Design a protein with these regions (language model features):
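Nucleotide-sugar donor-binding/catalytic module of glycosyltransferases
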Residues: 2-235
């Protein structure tokens, strides 16, 4: 079975209370073909110190981590784009988004995702499912029609949430100017997850999209860091 390389993108802003749990959930995975790209978006608390302390304590993992410290805030979408420009990523490598205040809920998360991609080589993207910190029901549901993403979600709302992964080859084909910038040429400063996933899903189509109904992601929707609660309405 093919063992895909994962690039885990972890974006942080003032999440010192949660970042250790996030990183611990990565290094305890039973799958070891991965690299972690951490971008701290100019946190004003002790997030960066917590990250460096963790990496010093687990220094045998240091070659798998790349910590980038922004000197000024750029916003989630700009950070997502930046994260995929700092490594030499190959077409079939898998990108996984794990926010700094969230965590993977089981040590086999990467193994399960890899197995599904290996068994379904034509699939290019996956999403769902998660456990909510507030106990709210997950919004993730299977995509059950061949109509476009925009048409499908119009009556039911957004359903493509954590746990989100995609093959890098899909990312290369996005029209980034059209997808990520407004009419004035300014990058969207909010709802980065939606801005990224929507064009990827449109490119892949339903038949090359996987839905996981196993909850492999713990989503802290009760923090001030939660992008969906704070900013999604701005998109």
């Amino acid at each position: 079975m093919k063992n895909h390389k994962f690039y885990i993108v972890t974006l942080c802003y003032n999440c010192e209370e949660y970042i250790n749990d996030c990183l611990e959930s990565i290094v305890t995975q039973q799958y070891d073909n991965y690299k972690v790209i951490i971008i701290d978006d100019a946190s004003s608390d002790g997030t960066v110190k917590r990250i460096k302390d963790f990496l010093n304590k687990h220094n045998h993992f240091n070659d798998r981590f790349n910590l980038i410290e922004n000197s000024e805030r750029k916003g989630p979408l700009a950070n997502h784009i930046q994260s995929l420009e700092v490594e030499e990523i190959k077409d079939n490598d898998i990108i996984l988004h794990l926010d700094g205040d969230d965590l993977l809920t089981c040590s086999t998360s990467l193994s399960i995702i890899n197995k599904n991609y290996a068994n379904n080589p034509n699939h290019l993207i996956s999403y769902g499912d998660y456990e909510s910190a507030t106990g709210k029901e997950s919004i993730c549901k299977p995509w059950q029609s061949n109509i476009s993403v925009s048409e499908y979600i119009a009556p039911i709302g957004w359903i493509f949430s954590h746990i989100r992964t995609f093959k890098y080859m899909l990312w290369k084909h996005i029209d980034k100017k059209l997808s990520f910038y407004d009419e004035e040429g300014k990058i969207f400063t909010s709802a980065g997850d939606v801005a990224i996933m929507k064009p990827l899903l449109e490119l892949a189509g339903r038949k090359r999209t996987m839905f996981f109904n196993k909850k492999m992601y713990y989503y802290r929707d009760n923090t001030s860091l939660n992008e969906h609660n704070d900013h999604l309405h701005d998109q």
